[in-house]
Amino acid sequence: AFQVNTNINALTTSAGATQLGLKNSLEKLSSGLRINKAADDASGMTISDSLRSQASALGQAISNANDGIGIIQVADKAMDEQLKILDTIKVKATQAAQDGQSLESRKAIQSDIIRLIQGLDNIGNTTSYNGQSLLSGQWTNKEFQIGTYSNQSIKVSVGSTTSDKIGQVRINTGAMITAASEATLTFKQINGGGTSPLEGVKISHSVGTGLGVLAEVINKNSDKTGIRAKASVETTSDKEIMSGNLKNLTINDVNIGNIVDIKKGDADGRLVQAINALTSSTGVEASTDSKGRLNLRSVDGRGIVLKADASEDNGDGKSAPMAIDAVNGGQSITDGEGAANYGRLSLVRLDARDIVLTSSDKPDENKFSAIGFGDNNVAMATVNLRDVLGKFDASVKSASGANYNAVIASGNSNLGAGVTTLVGAMLVMDIADSARKTLDKIRSDLGSVQGQMVSTVNNISVTQVNVKAAESRMREVDFAAESAEFNKYNILAQ
């Protein structure tokens, strides 16, 4: 038998549920989202909102890192140009560091170097990003947020690359050594990790000894100590060579012999020729300057010990000392006495740190007077690239070893401007090297930071994609499943 259902309440409830399901399904299909309101999935909405925020923050972090990379690239290219300038400065300083150059040609080279330094400073002062100067020393301790949460950042600093902040060179020169000794030195290592004891060297006038050998030992270890050395063993007489005779002239225990009828200022060169005839044995080379003064130079860095009897015919049968007996700043060599000059030791360090000599055997006896580095006997100075623009003063002249004997020291108190002297040109070479090392250090640090930023961008780009995918799976609708659900409710609603 047929039965007619008249449960209107049940039918109304069923129809309402069907319409609600149809409405929700249609909303999901039209928006493409599974979660359109908190009621759809409260916990899922919380998680997906968090993922969405994370993905958005990661997108901005990628932009931040790319901005940082751009800034670093601007600074790096600017410093690359500065390095090219420094290379040119060193080449020109090397060109000036030979005595084939006249004072005028050196002045021309100095003018070129001044222009180059001004160009370097112009780059340092004008390189900027978004109105911020990058190479003037003001752009330090900057941060770039490269993560989702606060303080996930990379710090960047760019040191100053202007001439007043780079090219520091520390120079020390000891007093002239006048007594034989033996030196065993220990230097602090360049990285501060310990000390580097050097082999002992005898300071005397025999072959294979002297400050020249000590300088070679120091230079062999410069990669560990950061210190280079130069020995200057040279003697100049105080006055013009006077006419007369030299008897029993001996240099470094090698008998030169008797030299008679020496002309004033050694006009005919007989004194110089006699000394140079035995240079291979004595290690000493002689010459006269424009004032007729005798100059003796050690060719291998050993000491110079000079002995002679000097006489001049005064017409009264008496003998008088010649000017040659006033060498080494006035030390007499008449009556067979010996005048000894073992030279001066100059040390160079291509940064502003002090040069520290120590002794691992006797740390309480670090006087070093035997090599001219005793208390209050050391000339010290620090110069930088900016100093090349002006004149090197008296302190720089002494510290660079230009005052290698008392006669030279009594002359012009200043070293001169930049490369206008041989010693100055060599000092500018060291300054250019030091400046290059400073710029290379800054560039390498920036390169490391740039590499870190690139790796970070690569990492968070992948992370962002995965976070977006996770958020999409949670928030977005499955069209196939939801279409089937919609069709079900649509059929029920008919």
From Swiss-Prot:
InterPro entries per UniProt: Flagellin (IPR001492), Flagellin_C (IPR046358), Flagellin_C_sub2 (IPR042187), Flagellin_hook_IN_motif (IPR010810), Flagellin_N (IPR001029)
Q: Which Pfam families match?
A: Flagellin_C, Flagellin_IN, Flagellin_N
The organism is Helicobacter mustelae
In its keyword annotation, does this UniProt entry include Secreted? Answer: yes
For this UniProt record, the keywords arranged alphabetically read as follows:
Bacterial flagellum, Secreted, Virulence
Q: What is this protein called?
A: Flagellin A
Please list the GO terms describing molecular function: structural molecule activity
Report the protein's function.
Answer: Flagellin is the subunit protein which polymerizes to form the filaments of bacterial flagella. Important for motility and virulence.
**Any one cellular-component term (Gene Ontology):** bacterial-type flagellum
Quote the subcellular location field of this record.
Secreted; Bacterial flagellum
Recall the taxonomic lineage recorded for the source organism.
Answer: Bacteria, Pseudomonadati, Campylobacterota, Epsilonproteobacteria, Campylobacterales
Q: Which family does it belong to?
A: Belongs to the bacterial flagellin family.
Instruction: Describe the subunit structure.
Output: Heteromer of FlaA and FlaB. FlaB is located proximal to the hook while the remainder of the filament is composed of the predominant FlaA.
